UniProtKB/Swiss-Prot annotation:
MF terms in GO: DNA binding; RNA binding
Domain RRM: 40-114
Name of this protein: RNA annealing protein YRA2
Listed CDD domains: RRM_YRA2
UniProt keyword terms in alphabetical order: DNA-binding, mRNA transport, Nucleus, RNA-binding, Transport
BP term (GO), one: poly(A)+ mRNA export from nucleus
Domain of life from the UniProt record: Eukaryota
Protein encoded by which gene: YRA2
Amino acid sequence: MSQNTKHHRVTNYRRRDLRNTLESRLGLPVEKRRLVPQLFRLKITNIGLDVSDYTILDIIKEFGEPEYINFRDHKDSRSCISDFKDNEIATKLIEKYNNFEINGKSIQVTLLDQQKRKRDADQERRKLRHGPRGGYGSHYTKSQKPIEQRNKTVDELNAELDAYMKES
C-alpha cells in the first residue's frame, strides 16, 4: 500500500517521554548538534552550447577538486553548478573566470547563497504541504495561538513548575 495516497497520511511518531522533556522545549545543546560542513556553491552561466563539459571541468579543477558538479542544458546556453569546501577556491575562480570569454560567449561565475536557497526550499515545501487554500484544518483558532513564541530558559521553566506545584 502506498503511503502517499490522498487519504492516507503517515506521520513521524515521537515517544511521549522524548516529546515532553525540557530538552525538546529548549533545543539541543550545541555539543549534541550535528555539524554539517559548509559548502560554497558556484554557478557558471552563459556557457555556449559548443563548449564541452570537459573544458569547464578543466577550468574548475585548475583551482581544486569540486565536491559536486552538475551541468544543465538550456534553450540557447548551458549552466554548471559546483560545490567547494574552501571559500578561497571559489573566490579565486570567480576573480579569474567571471566575464571570461569561451568560444565567443562571455561566461558569468557567481557564488550562490546556500542559506537563502534552503529558506526558499522550506517555503516551497510548506506551500506544497498545505496547498493553495491553507492547511488540513484544525480545531484551534488562529487567535488561540501566540503570535510570537520564544523559548523559555531553564530558570523560567523551574519557576513555572514551582508555582504549579504550590497551587496543588
